[in-house]
């Protein structure tokens, strides 16, 4: 069996396994609560949806497991809960539990981040701007501008983002398929030879521009930046590593803005507790996903994610065609 066939079978098996696990988990949760009654209290958090602690934990798992894999966490946080009958948790809940993912990035890349901070300070003091740390810091800063600009623009122009076309299942499916094809093209055309130590600040701007596409659910922030990194010939693991660092400002800003918006609504304890559970769950599973992906990409290609995204998009379109989710 060829590596590509193996990747396809692995992606297909993963898709089926995830669907079965979610289906079984939902069936168990409905038939017989796993948590004590006092632990499944619900509170309206965002988008008019009540989320209990079990659901918050599962949503945190989905966020953590998919945020740093090039398969779109936003798409899965929209599609999976709807498939389970929970409803769309909304932009606010999704953005807040992403703070757990950012905590995982700080946890995993603490030495890199402190090195970048020290490098920037030293470069400013000595006026020598050719160090890798300064280039990384500058690249992250410049690369954050596009997504912040277009994110603010979208917030101004789209009044009800939760129920807009941008968060529709059809948009998610099409975006997933298109990005799968682009990732496949990047795998084919990229040389995958440029190491992390050869990163330039211009790479941050290029990958940051690609990151802005992730405002469309289904595109995937890590997927778009990883794809851009492969197109500019970075090693797979190097592209992933910089992608994670690049996402820190954007995800943090989005999470804090939505958190402030929720806190301004004077949420009850029943609503705050699921946010805490979801964020902690997201942090733990994000850390595991980061560690796994970097190790995986040191030896393997991204074809498994190409096939997964194709299958994911086709399954959603098929389900919509059969009348589900409408």
From Swiss-Prot:
Keyword Hydrolase: yes
Catalysed reactions listed for this entry: di-trans,octa-cis-undecaprenyl diphosphate + H2O = di-trans,octa-cis-undecaprenyl phosphate + phosphate + H(+)
Keywords: Antibiotic resistance, Cell inner membrane, Cell membrane, Cell shape, Cell wall biogenesis/degradation, Hydrolase, Membrane, Peptidoglycan synthesis, Transmembrane, Transmembrane helix
Cellular location(s): Cell inner membrane
EC number: 3.6.1.27
Molecular functions (GO terms): undecaprenyl-diphosphatase activity
Origin superkingdom: Bacteria
Spans through the membrane: 11-31, 42-62, 90-110, 138-158, 165-185, 212-232, 242-262, 272-292, 304-324
Membrane topology: Multi-pass membrane protein
Purpose: Catalyzes the dephosphorylation of undecaprenyl diphosphate (UPP). Confers resistance to bacitracin.
NCBIfam families referenced in this protein's UniProt entry, alphabetically: PRK00281.2-5, undec_PP_bacA
Further information: Bacitracin is thought to be involved in the inhibition of peptidoglycan synthesis by sequestering undecaprenyl diphosphate, thereby reducing the pool of lipid carrier available.
Family per record: Belongs to the UppP family.
Protein name per the record: Undecaprenyl-diphosphatase
UniProt organism field: Synechocystis sp. (strain ATCC 27184 / PCC 6803 / Kazusa)
Source organism phylogeny: Bacteria, Bacillati, Cyanobacteriota, Cyanophyceae, Synechococcales
């Amino acid at each position: 069996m060829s590596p590509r066939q193996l990747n396809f079978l692995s992606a297909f098996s993963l898709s089926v396994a995830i669907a079965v696990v979610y289906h079984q988990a939902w069936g168990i949760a409905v038939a017989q609560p796993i948590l004590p009654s006092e632990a499944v209290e619900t509170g309206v958090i965002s988008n008019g949806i009540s989320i209990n602690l079990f659901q918050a934990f599962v949503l945190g798992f989905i966020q953590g497991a998919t945020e740093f894999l090039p398969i779109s966490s936003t798409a899965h946080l929209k599609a999976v809960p709807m498939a389970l009958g929970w409803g769309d948790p909304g932009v606010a809940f999704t953005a807040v539990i992403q703070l757990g993912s950012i905590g995982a990035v700080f946890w995993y890349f603490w030495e890199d981040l402190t090195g970048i901070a020290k490098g920037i300070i030293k470069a400013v003091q000595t006026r020598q701007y050719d160090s890798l740390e300064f280039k990384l810091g500058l690249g992250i800063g410049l690369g954050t501008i596009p997504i912040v600009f277009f994110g603010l623009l979208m917030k101004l122009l789209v009044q009800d983002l939760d129920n807009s076309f941008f968060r529709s299942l059809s948009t998610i499916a099409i975006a997933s398929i298109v990005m799968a094809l682009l990732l496949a093209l990047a795998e084919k055309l990229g040389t995958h030879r440029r190491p992390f130590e050869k990163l330039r600040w211009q790479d941050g701007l290029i990958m940051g521009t690609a990151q802005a596409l992730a405002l469309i659910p289904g595109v995937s922030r890590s997927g778009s930046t990883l794809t851009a990194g492969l197109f500019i010939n970075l090693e797979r693991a190097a592209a992933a590593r910089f992608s994670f660092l690049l996402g820190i400002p954007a995800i943090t800003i989005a999470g804090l803005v939505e958190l402030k918006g929720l806190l301004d609504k004077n949420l009850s304890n029943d609503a705050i507790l699921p946010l805490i559970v979801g964020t902690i769950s997201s942090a733990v599973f994000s850390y595991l996903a980061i560690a796994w992906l970097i190790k995986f990409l040191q030896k393997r290609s991204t074809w498994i994610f190409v096939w997964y995204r194709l299958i994911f998009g086709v399954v959603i379109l098929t389900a919509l065609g059969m009348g589900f989710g409408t």
